[in-house]
A protein has these predicted regions:
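An N-cap/entry alpha-helix motif that binds or orients negatively charged groups
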Residues: 2-67
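Hydrophobic faces of well-ordered beta-strands that scaffold small-molecule active sites
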Residues: 52-54, 87, 114-117
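Glycine-rich, proline-tolerant flexible connector loops at the mouths of alpha/beta enzymes
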Residues: 61-63, 86-103
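Alpha/beta enzyme core
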Residues: 70-85
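Alpha-helix-loop-beta-strand connector modules within alpha/beta enzyme cores
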Residues: 99-115
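Conserved small/polar residues in nucleotide/adenosyl-binding loops
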Residues: 119-125
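Short hydrophobic transmembrane-like helices used for membrane targeting/insertion
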Residues: 128-129
Length: 129
């Protein structure tokens, strides 16, 4: 089994677990509430000579641990000071060691729009919030 097969397998397990916790209707309601974030993100990167979207992640399947002393709050503040126009937070638990808590913590300390990155492997809409 290669790494992509492993990621897909683990993600399917997590999606099936999530289905028993939150209904698709609840997710859709949350997405409707968050629609203003999409336009905020678009406005922040549109019509910019240089619009950097900085990524925050603790690990990756290929590099394993990227930062032993991972401090996403400090990293977000540094990126914002350096001119990033948006942040991409990896929240995937198993291979990127992210979490929704990291996303929530970073959102409290920055004014930048933050899209949630399940982009490395998104399965059903259930996992996109």
């Amino acid at each position: 089994m290669n790494i992509l097969d492993e990621i897909v397998s683990k993600k399917r397990t997590r999606v099936n677990e999530a289905k028993s916790i939150v209904s698709i209707e609840d997710i859709q309601n949350q997405l409707e509430k968050l629609s203003s974030l999409k336009s905020n993100f678009k406005n922040n990167i549109e019509n910019q000579a240089q619009a950097i979207i900085a990524e925050i992640k603790k690990a990756s399947p290929s590099a394993v641990i990227i930062a032993e002393d991972f401090n996403p709050i400090l990293k977000a503040q540094e990126y914002e000071k350096m001119g990033a126009r948006a942040l991409s937070i990896l929240t995937e638990e198993d291979f990127f060691q992210g979490s929704n808590k990291v996303l929530q913590d970073v959102k409290k300390v920055t004014n930048l729009p933050i899209p949630v990155s399940y982009t490395h492997l998104t399965l059903p809409t259930k996992r996109i919030v």
